[in-house]
Design a protein with these regions (language model features):
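Hydrophobic small-molecule pocket/channel-lining residues, especially in calycin-type beta-barrels
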Residues: 1-183
Length: 183
């Protein structure tokens, strides 16, 4: 099944557009910050892994909080906060991304659309109660990004940040060993 899901790169007929999310392909580690309604910040180590899928017509990822490494630490008492996957598919007809998030741990399922806005990526959806939600990829560099989930009860006039991730790209095995890689 994994062999059928995996793709080595983007589909040639949409390779340029696929790089909006394709630039994240690889493994990342960082910090998860939850902004509780009472104003208290809760933090945990986190990881995310992006890869090409479905003949290069999708980018799929897996988000894990706390990270698998942190779960091995006997001093970490945080239970699993999330362990889910996102499937992102580019639609050339609308020039939008159709995105589905699934977290079986929390029984959380979100469908949204995504697009490039300036230097950022904005994904939007509404919850069952009508709350407008955005997931933002911002401060994007080849080796880091900042991810924000924010919500608005007044259709975007004011926003409340609920979750943030601060990620750094993990070094590949060849980078860790000092070997150079020719592409």
């Amino acid at each position: 099944m994994l062999e059928a899901l995996y793709a080595a790169g983007p589909a040639p007929d949409r390779a340029r557009q696929m790089m909006l999310y394709g630039r994240f392909v690889g493994s990342w580690e960082g910090r998860f910050v939850y902004h509780a309604p009472d104003g208290v910040l809760r933090e945990a180590p986190s990881e995310v892994h992006f890869g090409w899928a479905l003949e290069g017509r999708a980018v799929q990822d897996v988000w894990i909080v706390p990270s698998r490494h942190a779960r091995q630490d006997p001093n970490v008492s945080t239970p699993g906060i999330l362990y889910g996957t996102t499937l992102r598919v580019y639609d050339p007809r609308s020039d939008l991304w159709h995105i589905t998030w699934i977290d079986p741990l929390r029984q959380d399922y979100d469908r949204m659309t995504g697009r490039k806005v300036g230097d950022d990526i904005v994904q939007e959806f509404r919850t069952e109660d009508g709350t407008r939600c955005q997931w933002l990829f911002t401060e994007i560099t080849p080796s880091s990004f900042h991810w924000i989930r924010r919500e608005s009860k007044d259709d975007g006039k004011t926003w409340n940040v609920r979750v943030e991730f601060f990620f750094q790209r993990k070094a590949t095995e060849s980078e860790r060993s000092g070997r150079s890689v020719t592409l």
